[in-house]
Amino acid sequence: MGTQTLQMEKVKTLPVILGEVDILKTLQLLPGVQSSGEGNSGFYVRGGGPDQNLVLLDEATVYNSGHLFGFFSVFNSDAINSVTLIKGGMPAEYGGRLSSVVNVNMKEGNNQTYHATGGVGLIASRLTLEGPIQKGKSSFMMAARRTYIDALIKPFVSSTSTLSGSGYYFYDLNLKLNYQFSDKDRVFFSGYFGKDQFVFQGERFGIKFPWGNSTTTMRWNHLFNEKLFMNTTVLFSDYIFKIGASQSNFNFELFSGVRDYSTKVDFDYFPNIRNQVKFGGAYTFHTFTPTTATGTIGETSISPEKINRQYEKYVTKFK
């Protein structure tokens, strides 16, 4: 009862907002899940806050799962195969979270034929390509999405206006490659790159708000026998947030971010058809950069003597 898996074919049959299918908004329709605000992709699970949910994309942590200050999620529906929500009794392999685990899996691509899908919405368009690299053995999937809010607003702003350089947009890029070496070995690589960019440009004053996520996953699947299966995974996750301001000969920037390097090995053992035993271990090198300020006034630079970064290492074993 605490775990629910949704396939994208069913999710796409639900009504959508502004032409965009949103996985996280769909999860808000499930029992025990409540929206954090009207039209917002953040959600509460059994009383826990949105920041207490562990959001994973092909096992890599996504620290900010929203675009446009949470109005859209970062997950392009055309690139997603399924999403699993664990609301209670989270397995030890996830490292523990107070509220829930959202595990999103990307499509692996068709290894037989080529396909192209896309869509044009009110504020964003998307395109997905997939097909075989070596027929029957390897495949690829590439997906891109970009909003054109900046292009929609541009006709309403005069080219001579002091706000002509202002605007907002976001984009997502998804990539997945997989190769089957044998009946017992398979390797895949997946990556996600997304960014939001808000720019306000006045006659004498300008400000920029860029922020975004990047994730990378490399995994080796090995089948020892019909009862024992192994996954070896290397993960990278990065989130950055910046605020930049400029006026005349003055420039100022605030930067903060989170970066993870992880590796994990897990085994699945099936002693019989009714039981499954899962065990393994994981290591994470975690870097947290609190808000760091830099700036220039004319030819004078202002910067901290030392950037205050926090480094942490985690070693986890589970069974």
Task: Show where each model-derived region lies.
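Structural signature of outer-membrane beta-barrel domains
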Residues: 50, 60-62, 107, 123, ...
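Hydrophobic, lipid-facing positions within transmembrane beta-strands of outer-membrane proteins
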Residues: 23, 41, 98-100, 114-116, ...
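Extracytoplasmic loops and strand-loop junctions of Gram-negative outer membrane beta-barrel proteins
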Residues: 7-9, 65-66, 85-86, 109-112, ...
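Periplasmic N-terminal accessory/gating domains of Gram-negative outer-membrane beta-barrel systems
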Residues: 1-90, 101, 107-108
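Strand-connecting loop/turn motifs
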Residues: 52, 78, 111-113, 133-137, ...
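Outer-membrane beta-barrel domain signature
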Residues: 13, 70, 114-116, 160-165, ...
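Face-selective signature of the C-terminal outer-membrane beta-barrel domain
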Residues: 178-195, 210-319
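Predominantly transmembrane beta-strands of Gram-negative outer membrane beta-barrel pores used
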Residues: 54, 82-93, 99-107, 114-180, ...
